[in-house]
Amino acid sequence: TTHYLLLQALADEGIDPSSMTILDLRPNDIAAAWARGDLDAAWFWEPNLDKAVERGGNIFMTSGIMEKRGYPTWDVGVVMKKFAKEYPEYVEKFVKAECAGIDYWINNPAETAKIIAKELSLDLEDATRMMKGTEMVPCKKQLTSKYMGTSEDIGGFADTLVKTSKFLVSQKR
């Protein structure tokens, strides 16, 4: 989705992507290239973003800004219909666990940061900063028209998924 956001941001600003060299790199490779001074610009995230700023980088675009421009991006979990029909109890358990995790994140940020730091081998400061840049949407709010919606009222996520899918097809991804 970062590639999608980058190209949408360039289009919004009237910049032709063919006027530059765009590289598709993994996060750690971006950070290393940035540290070496090999890149003029990059779209990446914590824990490397803060380090880039410390080395003279300036944040001029974020996924939050792009969401306000009409390009939200999402992290979602999906299952195949066949799996959901065969194992509805597992799907229900997963959704409940996911919702409990989101609630824990929202209600216990300090403890969540410790867990993330340990799990991802990050400094606590990096994990805390990373969390601040991540919006966790409570499950009840996900069932509103802005997000997933309901079976009777399909939410904005469906539109976003269609736009992103068309983009990925156009990029042969």
List each model region and its residues.
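Conserved donor sugar-nucleotide recognition element shared by glycan-biosynthetic enzymes
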Residues: 2, 27-30
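Ligand-binding cleft/hinge of the Venus flytrap
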Residues: 3-21, 53-55
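Residue-level marker of alpha-helix boundaries and capping positions
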Residues: 21, 39-40, 155
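General small-molecule cofactor/ligand-binding pocket signal
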Residues: 21-23, 60-61
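Pocket-lining segment of extracytoplasmic ligand-binding domains
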Residues: 29-120, 125
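Secondary-structure end/capping motifs
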Residues: 85-173
